[in-house]
């Protein structure tokens, strides 16, 4: 598959799963029936977003009139439009009260993608330029000097920039954690809950390869993953 095709699959699948209860309702099935009704769900997704339907034999069985009728009913129910299952609506309302509707709506949005520039290998501007050559568009994140927000649908992990270790995918908020520690080259630093090493690698970049950085975690497989990422990052 081409990178753009991979990105499209990720986009559609992600939205279907985030709002599965909505798309099941629009398709006229129960959530437990979703696995056996993939194509009907895909037809509902395309109709909901007013995108041309894929050419598939199941399209003949897609009832546009029934879909529009279900959509009209769904629009009367904000919980359903957000794709929120009943159990989560109950839990969110109990724990967050009046703040829950805004949180629920946010859960239905497509998550933003952020990159952390590996300063051991490039600058933010150099990474932007390199990604642009591979049809990946980005914008700087205000207040987070190491972050870029991806604004295009692209298969990031097939880019040369990723293979060369120029970036890691990391939430902009997470990038602020390492920055708050104010580490500097030559320090001795311990990351006692390293996981797969996103923040560890950020610390390593801030230390410019000088000093000692010890990564620890109770899960050995995560540290093995970190070793591979560290080699790619040149840390």
Regions found by a protein language model. Name each.
Residues 1-157:
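Class I Rossmann-like S-adenosyl-L-methionine
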Residues 125-235:
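Rossmann-like S-adenosyl-L-methionine
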């Amino acid at each position: 598959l081409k990178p753009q095709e991979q990105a499209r699959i990720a986009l559609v699948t992600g939205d279907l799963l985030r709002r599965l209860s909505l798309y099941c309702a629009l398709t006229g099935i129960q959530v437990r029936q979703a696995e056996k009704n993939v194509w009907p769900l895909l037809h509902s997704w395309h109709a909901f977003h007013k995108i041309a339907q894929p050419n598939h034999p199941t399209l003949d069985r897609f009832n546009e009139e029934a879909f529009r009728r279900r959509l009209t009913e769904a629009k009367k129910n904000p919980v359903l439009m957000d794709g929120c299952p009943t159990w989560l609506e109950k839990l969110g309302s109990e724990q967050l009260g009046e703040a829950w509707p805004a949180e629920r709506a946010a859960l239905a949005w497509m998550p933003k993608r952020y990159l952390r520039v590996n300063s051991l290998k490039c600058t933010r501007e150099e990474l932007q330029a390199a990604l642009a050559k591979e049809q990946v568009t980005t914008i700087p994140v205000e207040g987070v000097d190491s972050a870029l927000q991806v604004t295009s649908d692209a298969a990031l992990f097939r880019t040369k920039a990723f293979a060369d270790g120029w970036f890691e995918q990391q939430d902009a908020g997470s990038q602020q954690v390492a920055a708050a520690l104010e580490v500097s080259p030559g320090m001795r630093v311990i990351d006692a809950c390293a996981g797969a090493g996103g923040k560890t690698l950020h610390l390593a970049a801030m230390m410019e390869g000088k000093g000692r950085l010890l990564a620890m975690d109770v899960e050995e497989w995560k540290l093995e993953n970190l070793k591979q990422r560290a080699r790619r990052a040149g840390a």
